[in-house]
């Protein structure tokens, strides 16, 4: 496999750790770290990737998983904020929507290792392909959200 990290981080210590990681694996040509953001590169990576890992501690909305779903790149996310509202997994007690990714609770290395292991074990199986099909069907347009907002506004303006 190939690991690519793209992101912005002002923390010098974190940048140094990822730079060292890339240097350590440089001879394999399988690790690439990109600091900064390039929309064209991001689109190409989403379209080419099999998985997108978003292990956020906090995520009020989350666009990364939405881009991922759009390109049928299976999101692997921590159940928090907007990630929890848009990515559904069989591991959820009662998934209300069709499964379209992998979710985990524990914000630690064990949690990430567990979910990545689970995702890799299912890679290219019927379960993985079902997630891809469901990912393509996710409606991320404003159509439904707009209708919901209009209903709220109607309720609060009619006394």
What role is predicted for each listed range?
Residues 1, 73, 140:
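Short glycine/serine/threonine/alanine-rich loop segments
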Residues 19-22, 91-93, 159:
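Short low-complexity, flexible loop/linker segments enriched in glycine and/or proline
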Residues 142-159:
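C-terminal alpha-helical cap of glycosyltransferases
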Residues 12, 109-110, 143:
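Loop/helix-junction capping segments adjacent to catalytic residues or to phosphate/diphosphate-binding pockets
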Residues 16-18, 89, 149:
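Short aromatic-enriched loop/helix-cap "lid" or pocket-rim segments at secondary-structure transitions
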Residues 3-44:
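Nucleotide-activated donor-binding/catalytic signature segment of Leloir-type glycosyltransferases, i.e.
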Residues 39, 44-132, 136-137:
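Catalytic binding pocket for nucleotide-activated donors in carbohydrate/polymer assembly enzymes
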Residues 11, 83-84, 150:
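Positions that flank functional sites
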